Amino acid sequence: MLSKIRWLGVVIALDLILLLGIGVQAVSYSESGVTCDIGTEGLPPLLADLLAVPQSVADDASRLATGLFGDCQEKCDYFVNQLLAIYSEAKDKDFVMIFNPGGWGWDFVETSPGWWSIFNGIESELESSGYTSLMLNHRRAVDSFLGRLDEAREMITGYKSKAMDLASRIEFLTTHIPDLKVILAGESTGAIITDSVMKILADNQQVYSIQTGPPFWHQNNILDRTLVLTDNGIVPDSFSRGDFWTIIWDNLKALFGFSQPVDGFGTILNYVEAPGHDYWWQYSEVCFEITNFLRQNFALK
């Protein structure tokens, strides 16, 4: 009997040590975001010609990196290279649009069907008014166990560190490209970090945001220069409204084969169906609201 108790104690102790180790690793783990071109599968942009970047711009990028990552030279270099490459791509553009995905934060706009249609719609509207634009992804997490833990921790704290990272990138662009307009796009949980960035950059009149389907527990801090959609005009967004009964009922029907899930239509963290939690340019209400927002803020034709 005593040996069994000792064995049980050993098992419990090992479990506690394992959980403690995971907890310590999760707390210390922090993944740097990647702002990248569409279609590159998350690879950071490459700086074609460093000599074409003014020295003052390069120095400011280094200063920002040190402020964010301290003496971690690898992270600093990674951050600086991204900043300067994006600066080089954006310096002759009128608009930069940055997509913040929902789910766990590692999806791309080209694999998010609803927002891909919206991106194309916005780009077309800007182009028809004679504006040039650069469309980017911002991947804030990696697809791994620690990546999930890090994302969950950030989500709970309102993306305190990840929002500062992204806000620094945007502030850098708008400082060194004075006529540039930046539109932040946030889908579902990505709307939380988008709102947090807008709060940090509340006084930056060059930055705007479009958010769709923010979670029901999140209350937007900043509404100036911001469009928040919680209804696609077809079905009320059950996730934004916290309509748990609709979510549960819809998933039960799918579980027992009474309905078939449709790829790209309303899921939470890539797994749970949420009726109405999808936004497409083809939806007349979505198209109208976004087009109206663009025309009011940017005097589109």
List each language-model region with its residue ranges:
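Active-site catalytic motif of lipid deacylating hydrolases and related acyltransferases
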Residues: Y29-Q73, L84-L180, F258-W280
